[in-house]
Amino acid sequence: MEKKQKGTFTLRRLFPALHEEELVRIQDSSSVIRLRKGQNLFISGDSPRSIYGVANGCLKIVRESTEGESVITRVVRPGNIVGIREVFGEFKYSRTSVALKDSEVFSIDAQAVMDMISRSPAV
């Protein structure tokens, strides 16, 4: 998993009600994660530290069945986000995220999002 600063994902798509100043704050606390096909973004049981927006590529969210098989519960495409429920619920991931193909994911620091919401509750 390779990280690089900034990215092509548009924060405006995630937070359309934000003023430019708030978008810059969020962008400053964000990075792009590049995943190869088959790589995990997060694993069931991990503690959430970020909210993720898919910029390019595609992820699947899977859970293990009682028989030990992986069951796809969601496919996350460009422009969609993942991890909000875990961040705001303050609990660990109950599923695993796997790149279906090479992907770029915008990682937004969870604390920065919480701070933004306290400043701009309309979001």
Residue ranges and their predicted role:
Residues 1-37, 81, 86-87:
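Cyclic nucleotide-binding regulatory module and flanking cytosolic helices
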Residues 30, 48-49:
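Short loop/turn microsegments at loop-to-beta-strand junctions
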Residues 34, 40, 72:
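Conserved beta-strand positions that form and line the central face of beta-propeller blades
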Residues 38, 49-62, 78-79:
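Glycine- and acidic-residue-biased ligand/ion/polar-headgroup-sensing regions
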Residues 41-46:
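Short phosphate-coordinating micro-motif centered on Lys-Gly-acidic
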Residues 66-71:
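Short alpha-helix-to-loop micro-motif enriched in aromatics/charged/Gly
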Residues 74-123:
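Cyclic-nucleotide recognition modules
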